[in-house]
């Protein structure tokens, strides 16, 4: 009993430390940018003690960006955890089902074929105004991502929801979306191609309060549902047959989990672009710290995802001269070495 209590205290302490780290990273994120701010100036703007440029920068630009990092980081990380548990595959991530590829195709179709979100008044890049209808590309990106999810899950129902079938179907359909995107870009004008490529970059700078609210609703609903199903995920860790003997409807659990994870990913990607590796780095780091118990790993994954995306966004704005680098590039640079380490560690473990 004492050992269990000490483990509970340890896990609680880890969650508290993660929460404190998120708060500190958020405050640091507010201070970094092309217009650097001191701690006192940032606090004055947050507390409404001053107006002017500082307040407009904080509340009009940096707060929406900060909220997007918090929400999307949590959503992508929890999505990765759900996919890894549901599929029994440590390499699974929000891109496993081709969600990101479908969203990119939808956005490219909107921008290249219909000038969605852009006012096309000629062939000069200066004539493309991304502020005309910023939701056009996002809407089509989400619709194609959702359609891809439903298509894969529908096909997999025919094969009793085998995890291997899900992964292979996701890879195959992702390749189809990538090929279709390539064809679209091949026939695009120079300006349309540039706009489409820029959209695909993971960029928190396009976040607004409206998009943050939509992402918040989707991610909160998905995370709460996942937390309510945590004991079923713990049972699934023992294997599908063992989970069935405990009264868990394994095919239904996998269906709900993959649908939830994919929809959270689709919402985030449709507004912010592709942000990779968050769903791989954070869940695995959390499992090493806290173990496999989903009562702890779900909230810890959400916090660690928010922390990673905050730090990546801060780094992207620190490295960019006058403008922020795409945050998706930063997470990929951090995630690729981690992914290779994971691959080699699994190989070593299997050879023992």
Language-model features, listed with the residues they occupy:
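Alpha-helical transmembrane segments in inner-membrane proteins
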Residues: 1-352
């Amino acid at each position: 009993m004492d050992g269990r209590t000490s483990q509970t205290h340890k896990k609680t302490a880890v969650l508290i430390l993660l929460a404190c780290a998120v708060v500190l990273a958020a405050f640091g994120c507010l201070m970094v940018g092309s217009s650097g701010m001191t701690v006192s100036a940032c606090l004055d703007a947050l507390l409404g003690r001053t107006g002017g440029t500082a307040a407009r920068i904080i509340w009009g630009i940096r707060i929406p960006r900060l909220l997007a990092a918090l929400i999307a980081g949590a959503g992508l990380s929890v999505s990765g955890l759900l996919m890894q548990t549901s599929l029994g595959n440590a390499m699974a991530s929000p891109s496993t089902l081709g969600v990101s590829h479908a969203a990119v195709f939808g956005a490219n179709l909107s921008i290249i074929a219909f000038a969605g979100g852009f006012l096309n008044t000629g062939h000069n890049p200066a004539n493309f105004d991304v502020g005309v209808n910023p939701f056009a590309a996002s809407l089509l990106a989400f619709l194609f991502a959702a359609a891809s999810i439903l298509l894969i899950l529908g096909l997999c129902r025919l094969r009793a929801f085998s995890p291997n079938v899900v992964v292979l179907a996701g890879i195959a359909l992702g390749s189809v979306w990538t090929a279709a995107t390539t064809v679209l870009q091949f026939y695009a004008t120079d300006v349309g191609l540039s706009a489409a490529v820029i959209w695909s970059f993971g960029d928190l700078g396009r976040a607004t309060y409206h998009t943050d609210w939509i992402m918040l609703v989707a991610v909160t609903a998905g995370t709460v549902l996942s937390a309510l199903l945590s004991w079923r995920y713990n049972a699934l860790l023992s294997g599908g047959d063992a989970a069935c003997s405990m009264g868990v409807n394994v095919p239904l659990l996998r269906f709900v989990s993959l649908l939830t994870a994919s929809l959270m990913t689709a919402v985030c990607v449709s507004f912010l672009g592709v942000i990779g590796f968050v769903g791989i780095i954070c869940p695995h780091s959390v499992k090493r710290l806290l173990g496999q118990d989903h009562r702890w790993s779900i909230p810890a994954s959400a916090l660690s995802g928010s922390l990673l995306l905050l730090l990546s966004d801060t780094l992207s704005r620190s490295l960019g001269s006058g403008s922020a680098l795409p945050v998706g590039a930063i997470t990929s640079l951090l995630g690729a070495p981690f992914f290779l380490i994971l691959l080699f560690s699994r190989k070593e473990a299997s050879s023992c």
